Amino acid sequence: MWFRTANLALVLIAALAAGPALSAELSPDAINSSEPSKKSVSKDKATPAGVRLQVLLDRAHFSPGEIDGKFGENARKALRAYAEAQQLPSADRPTQVVWKALRADEQPVNSDYAITEKDVAGPFLEKLPSKMEEMKDIPKLGYTSPREALAEKFHMSEQLLAALNPGKNFDRAGEAIVVVDTGGAERGEAAKADRIEVDKTRQTVKLFDKSNALIVFYPATIGSEEKLSPSGTLKVTEVSRSPTYRYNPDYHFKGVRSDKPFTIKPGPQ
């Protein structure tokens, strides 16, 4: 028993020690002065250069997914798409030529934000059910905390938000915090899309303008083993910003026991 207690104590000490260290490393100054390179980004660890790279890609309308400071697969996909759009050599890492194009946006990639009454008003869920059948009885698939809502609002992971704001109270209106700035002073609206390319194999969505130039990129989860997405040329006939999910029992999703159709309310906006 003593060994288990001692091991647990060591784990807790290590976790507490890692928190301040990570926060110090991911300071606004460190992030804004960082230079992404093969050595300064990591798929396993959040780094200042990883944060800056992800934010600049997001500003350019080439989404790396959730901004967490890590150079994971979604960030890699976004970087490749950005290089393609800029007619630069394909890049799996932030090469000098690609970074030169991205860093033309010289605005800081973070900004100060004061938490509002609306941010903390809720209502918040105690816990989001893991099973689909349990979700159908919830009036709205909301967030579980102000911290989760704030992270989503600024395209960030909760872990990165916490690392940038050690000791801050995310439940208190008026609290000043640091967030990543995916808007940026120079960001404008993307050109109007004329064509959408959904790649089921690469799990990506690309938007092209009338001149066939790539203007927007998103990583995406497309279809599943139970419900394959259609192939071919389709036409967008309707856009729903708050869609209701409708479960069809004919697909027999894993983990879903219901033999009757049901709906799941829209999530937060």
Give short role names for the model-derived ranges.
Residues 43-77, 119-155:
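Primarily a LysM-type cell-wall glycan-binding module
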Residues 64, 147, 158-166, 179-194, ...:
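N-terminal post-signal-peptidase region of extra-cytosolic proteins
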Residues 73-119, 162-195:
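Extracellular LysM carbohydrate-binding repeats and other cell-envelope/extracellular binding modules
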Residues 189-269:
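Gly/Pro-biased beta-strand-loop elements
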